[in-house]
Amino acid sequence: GTITVNSDDKYLDFNTRNMLEWILFKNKYSSKIKAAYLTEKYNYYENKNSDTYTFGQVNSLFLRHDFLYSISESITINTLLDFTQSDAKGSDLLTETRTIGTGSILWKHKLSTKLNYELGIRQEVTDTYESPLLFSAGTSFALTEYYTIKANLSKNFRIPTFNDLYWQGSGNPDLNPEHSLQGEISNEFSYKNSKFVLTGFLIQLKDMIRWIPKSNGLWQPENTQNVTNYGLEMLFETKKSIGKHLFSFTTSYGYTVSENNETEKQLTYVPNHKANANLAYNYKSFTTYYQWMYTGEVFTSSDNFYKLDDYALSNIGIDYNFGKKKTYLLGFQVLNLTNENYQNVISRPMPGRNFKLYLTLNL
């Protein structure tokens, strides 16, 4: 619910993930085969006190063959073959099956100890959408021991997901696939245990798929015909070891312009400024940390008249890993430590100070 729209609904979901992997290593090549089966199901109760509900269910089979061959010490070629079949059913559709096949080739060439490049092509075939031939290109050049410059260019394509198309009460079956062309240049400075990265990026998108909150309180996906994203990202990280004690600090800042080319206005709910910082202390299997996150103001109307204020949040946490070769992680967090009153969507107040206890098992 929201401040202006009351809600008495309930949402239940149940998901499973199962995967098998076979790996073969030889002198000049490696071969990996993965098979995964995923199930996703949800029930939505408009009235949580009623037994009446709508539902959606997707069962997906994923197959992948990853083959890597070393032509020489400086050249490798990597081929990827992917197959996905998803069967969906739900209250808003009888049955829907989507089959996707993908082939990719990636060439990597290390010209010297300082300079390398890579080239890739990718073709996706579906029974629903016509996909263009996609490409990627990248290079990395270490000008000095402390400074490396990197550049990447790629053409991308994304088809709407089942949730985009058929989510109960919110899906949009008329969505078009999203096309994009993006490039970035990164400058990486490193010294001992510290690193600073400055990245500039530019992305041109056609039919961008975005979920937008509507006046009735529901989020719905739509295409925005032409969008330009550009900006800067900065990252700094450092760490210091004293015996078995490890201290680490990471901070980042991003400035993003995401503009509708027709209106020349910033897209709704995309902040110009985002920043975060993380300070952590580790001793053997014990870790404690402090997190700080800042989100700048966002516009809530396409004419950029209405907006939500910026906010900053703090979290603290502690965890202990009981495993040695495996992960058995028990942790506790205090979220929104300062009890900040904020909204990241209009009329939807976010939780105040709250607590989280978690157990992570990696068998």
Give short role names for the model-derived ranges.
Residues 3-25, 148, 152-206, 212-241, ...:
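Outer-membrane beta-barrel signature, preferentially recognizing the C-terminal barrel domain
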Residues 72-78, 85-205, 250-252:
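Structural signature of Gram-negative outer-membrane beta-barrels, strongest in the C-terminal barrel
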Residues 1-60:
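Flexible loop and strand-edge segments within Gram-negative outer membrane beta-barrel domains
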Residues 18-24, 63-69, 105-109, 137-141, ...:
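Residues on the lipid-exposed face of transmembrane beta-strands in outer-membrane beta-barrel proteins
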Residues 204-206, 297-300, 318-363:
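C-terminal beta-signal and adjacent terminal beta-strands/loops
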Residues 112, 202-204, 223-299, 324, ...:
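Gram-negative outer-membrane beta-barrel transporters
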